[in-house]
Amino acid sequence: MKTYVFIPARYGSSRLPGKPLKLINGKPMIQHVFERISKATGIEAVYVATDDDRIKEVVEKFGGNVVMTPPEAESGTDRIAQAAQALDLKEDDLIVNVQGDQPLVNQGSIEAVIAPFKAADYDGSFEMSTLSFKIVNEAEITSPKDVKLVTDVNGFALYFSRATIPHGRDYWDHDSYKHLGVYAYTKRFVDLFNTLPMGHLEDIEKLEQLRALEYGHKIKVVESEWDSPEVDLPGDIEMMEALLNAGH
């Protein structure tokens, strides 16, 4: 089982066109993500999967690897499946999917999300993992932009939602966790996932990972020590620059 990291990147964005190429402290956002991920141990290579020549040119300019994918890819997972096919990855190879709008993603998060597959007691009962982070900013608890999640006693996801979950009936004395946009799965599962029709809950919440749960597949959740906020709006860039300048 070899591990490959993919960053799906598209130029079009309704709220922030050209998002992967936006400069953060003078460096394209996609470069921040690529360089941080590349520091992780236990991975073979990092690839940007895109259908856009502008992104390809920038990535190759800073020495990154690019896999061009068809423009009709419907999602990041679909784009990654196409890239993995182009690279002739094996069924048991591990694919890590990192959203390209997380310029503060930590290498430790990459190592954490693949750890369940590398564990000595891994029995193949799950083929997908992801990350959570304990919410410290109370505004994120009620923000639909920040996806919350709950797990069972064994650390497997029960549900992901834009709503506040769990929601205390009478009082609030529990921790809440948000989902981070990092996934790991076998190539075999990625191929299977892309054959499944969109789930009802997935369509309502607009959360692709719910498709796996709706069709009965387990998702192992690992709590990360590092937050990795996403860039969605122009104002987020200033926030990222401030965090980078503060040493994040």
UniProtKB/Swiss-Prot annotation:
This is 3-deoxy-manno-octulosonate cytidylyltransferase 2. Its EC number is 2.7.7.38. Its main location: cytoplasm. InterPro entries: Cytidylyl_trans, KdsB, Nucleotide-diphossugar_trans. GO terms for cellular component: cytosol. It holds the Pfam family CTP_transf_3. It comes from the Bacteria. It is found in: Cytoplasm. Belongs to the KdsB family. NCBIfam families: kdsB, PRK05450.1-3, PRK05450.1-5, PRK13368.1. One of its GO terms (molecular function) is 3-deoxy-manno-octulosonate cytidylyltransferase activity. It catalyses: 3-deoxy-alpha-D-manno-oct-2-ulosonate + CTP = CMP-3-deoxy-beta-D-manno-octulosonate + diphosphate. Activates KDO (a required 8-carbon sugar) for incorporation into bacterial lipopolysaccharide in Gram-negative bacteria. It is an enzyme of class 2 (transferase). The gene is kdsB2. One of its GO terms (biological process) is lipopolysaccharide biosynthetic process.
